[in-house]
């Protein structure tokens, strides 16, 4: 079992049950999935960009990546319908907890000039989104072998009913929020 999953079951869930005054342990908010997305606007001119992004995201997550395609043509962005414009991957269960553990203990401390995560990046339903400017903060990526620095979006989907419950859950996981 993943280390963070065990900590959630033994320490975080009982503590949150008390803190949020819930009657049943199944009501306690939990992280259901983590979605990583890399939007690749520069892939329009160069198909190799998609291949490199797929390889990077597969190294980071240890899971097969899905290429996303443009739904409709947009002349202003020089995009045609059906062209590959990004990659994404959804993590659940043990892989999700292992990724979250690596993100909190290894990757976020490696961010340059890191002052903490924005506590206002919740969506109103307890889900949290954050952006990473460089993929090299992950230990799986070798700095010498990358072709370009790319950012990615990380979304944590929770069962929390509102932002306060979601914030309490992520604080219990020791997320380094700014305020």
Swiss-Prot record:
InterPro entries to which the protein is assigned, alphabetical: Ribosomal_uL5 (IPR002132), Ribosomal_uL5_bac-type (IPR020930), Ribosomal_uL5_C (IPR031309), Ribosomal_uL5_CS (IPR020929), Ribosomal_uL5_dom_sf (IPR022803), Ribosomal_uL5_N (IPR031310)
GO cellular component assignments: ribonucleoprotein complex; ribosome
SUPFAM superfamilies in the record: RL5-like
Coiled coil (residue ranges): none
GO biological process: one example: translation
Swiss-Prot/TrEMBL keywords: Ribonucleoprotein, Ribosomal protein, RNA-binding, rRNA-binding, tRNA-binding
Highest taxon in the source lineage: Bacteria
Gene Ontology molecular functions: rRNA binding; structural constituent of ribosome; tRNA binding
Oligomeric form and interacting partners: Part of the 50S ribosomal subunit; part of the 5S rRNA/L5/L18/L25 subcomplex. Contacts the 5S rRNA and the P site tRNA. Forms a bridge to the 30S subunit in the 70S ribosome.
Family statement: Belongs to the universal ribosomal protein uL5 family.
Function: This is one of the proteins that bind and probably mediate the attachment of the 5S RNA into the large ribosomal subunit, where it forms part of the central protuberance. In the 70S ribosome it contacts protein S13 of the 30S subunit (bridge B1b), connecting the 2 subunits; this bridge is implicated in subunit movement. Contacts the P site tRNA; the 5S rRNA and some of its associated proteins might help stabilize positioning of ribosome-bound tRNAs.
The protein, known as: Large ribosomal subunit protein uL5
């Amino acid at each position: 079992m993943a280390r963070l999953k065990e900590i959630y079951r033994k320490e975080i869930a009982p503590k949150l049950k008390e803190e949020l005054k819930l009657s049943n342990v199944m009501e306690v908010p939990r992280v259901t999935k983590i979605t990583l997305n890399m939007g690749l606007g520069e892939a329009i001119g160069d198909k190799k960009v998609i291949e490199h992004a797929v390889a990077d995201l597969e190294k980071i997550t240890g899971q097969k990546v899905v290429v996303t395609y443009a739904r409709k043509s947009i002349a202003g962005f020089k995009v045609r319908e059906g062209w590959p414009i990004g990659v994404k991957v959804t993590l659940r269960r043990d892989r999700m907890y292992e990724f979250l553990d690596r993100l909190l203990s290894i990757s976020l401390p490696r961010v340059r000039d890191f002052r903490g995560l924005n506590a206002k990046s919740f969506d109103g339903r307890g889900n949290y989104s954050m952006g990473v400017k460089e993929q090299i903060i992950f230990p799986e990526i070798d700095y010498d072998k990358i072709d370009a620095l790319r950012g990615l979006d990380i979304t944590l989907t929770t069962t929390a009913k509102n932002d306060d419950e979601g914030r309490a859950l992520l604080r219990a996981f020791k997320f380094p929020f700014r305020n």
